[in-house]
């Protein structure tokens, strides 16, 4: 306030409670999402949810106003070389531009719900996570009101 003319009466009302980092590490997954998946409404047999075409980063801004959407494949949460592990949230497998879409909190929630259901069904059935019954996962998603197609 002292050093900026015109700001003598300014007061701080609020500030971010935590530092956010937008771009972090991602897994090398059984399937890595691509820019094409995001831009061309990628469709997958193992879809666990949908997310609108929304890219915000790396000099690209596409706002989710078109009605276009991509499906999030279950395989993008299965890391290569590690058995019985799911990785949800902004660390799911994908290239740089797909990450600008999938790192958003709402998309992370979509992946998290799918991961939680898959994990529960894996434990219940005794199946490994890479062998979980996708029809059962999708049926439970539908029962919970999730749009995955």
Residue ranges and their predicted role:
Residues 1-149:
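Flavin (FAD/FMN)-binding glycine-rich loop and adjacent Rossmann-like elements that form
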């Amino acid at each position: 306030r002292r050093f900026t003319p015109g700001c003598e009466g300014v007061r701080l009302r609020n500030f971010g409670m935590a530092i956010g980092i937008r771009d972090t590490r991602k897994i090398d997954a059984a399937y890595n999402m691509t820019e094409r998946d995001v831009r061309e409404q990628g469709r997958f047999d193992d879809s666990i949810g949908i997310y609108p075409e929304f890219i915000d980063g790396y000099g690209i801004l596409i706002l989710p106003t078109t009605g276009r959407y991509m499906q999030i494949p279950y395989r993008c949460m299965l890391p290569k070389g590690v058995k019985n592990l799911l990785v949800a949230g902004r660390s799911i497998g994908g290239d740089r531009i797909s990450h600008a879409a999938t790192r958003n909190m709402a998309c992370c929630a979509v992946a998290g719900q799918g991961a939680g259901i898959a994990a529960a069904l894996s434990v219940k059935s005794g199946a490994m996570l890479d062998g979980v019954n996708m029809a059962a996962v999708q049926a439970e998603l539908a029962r919970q009101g999730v749009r995955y197609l």
